[in-house]
Amino acid sequence: MLPRRFASVEELEDTMTTPSAALVDTLKNLPGDIMVLGVGGKMGPTLARMAKRAAPGKRIIGVARFSEPGLQQALQSHGIECITADLSSREELARLPDIPNIVFMAGRKFGSSGSEWLTWAMNAYVPALVAERFSQSRIVTFSTACVYPFVDVTSGGASESAPLTPPPGEYANSCVARERLFQHFSHQLGTPGRFLRLSYAIDMRYGVLHDIGKKLIAGEPIDLSMGHANIIWQGDANDWALRTLAHCTAPASGLNISGPPILIRDAATALASRLGVQPIFTGTEAPTAWLVNIDEALRLFGPPHVPLDTLLDWTADWISRDMASLGKPTHYEARDGRY
């Protein structure tokens, strides 16, 4: 039974980290412990907590710089072992324990413009180091739908076999490099893996719906030029990511992770109705967008647990009460690759 609303961040995160029965079963049958590299991002803490709740007998290890005050202590309070390390350091990587299951979540997107050198280091150099260091592990890597080109909005979305030829922009191309570096070492060393080409996870504190809702409340126009997007509840995305550890391939291969596509206009109209405001639109829908085909994920995992109408209800309620925000816009409307 899904809640009607979240009274607090704690209640939100408790719901978001509740594992499915399928995940509990998957991790029960998965040999070895799990280490999350780059656990300190938007999704990492809840993924680690979900893993621990699903498999309390396993070691769940989170690795990050832990620059956010209180994050390490919060994770430890939920039974997650924490190791402070810089993943760009060979020496610090060498000191990490040998763990058979790796979830790689490190990367850089927001603020990429103006410091492209750091974007490429985080998204290409670090993956090469990690691939070498953990060649004997399974590696599930968080990637992005941005590795694909824009596709016709009537096409059903890019499948995993689509060419990795994104539109101009250094961020998207650095993400192709991340996959290609992991893929190189997977071919050379036989490392099993999977690239999670994620499209827009939804948390009440950030995400496409959060961005739209904030603009509606502020009376700002909604740009329709990127008129379509795939979105998925972050709890579902984390659940699928952890279950993917049982579906790694050698050599590593892609897997699209998201929910069905939405129309930005329709989502904004639905949120505006719930918020009691009138939407203001600007621009017109382009005939192409970053859309993914999720048939393979649906075959492996079944449909997402949380439907769109529930995400809309939750988002409108959260924003109307001026609850917490991460202050990290998705820039879903960007078509020029600049973030």
Language model: regions and residue ranges:
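Amphipathic terminal alpha-helices
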Residues: 2-27, 308-339
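Short alpha-helix in the Rossmann-fold core of NAD(P)-dependent oxidoreductases
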Residues: 115, 119-127, 140, 174-175
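NAD(P)-dependent short-chain dehydrogenase/reductase
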Residues: 168, 176-230, 234-236, 271
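Conserved Rossmann-fold NAD(P)-dependent oxidoreductase catalytic core, especially the SDR/UDP-sugar
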Residues: 33, 101-105, 109, 125-170
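NAD(P)H-binding glycine-rich loop region in Rossmannoid oxidoreductase-like domains
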Residues: 45, 69, 74-122
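Conserved glycine-rich Rossmann-like NAD(P)H-binding loop of the short-chain dehydrogenase/reductase
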Residues: 57-70
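Mid/C-terminal beta-alpha module of Rossmann-like enzyme folds, strongest
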Residues: 220, 227, 240-296, 323, ...
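N-terminal Rossmann NAD(P)H-binding glycine-rich loop of SDR-like oxidoreductase domains
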Residues: 35-52
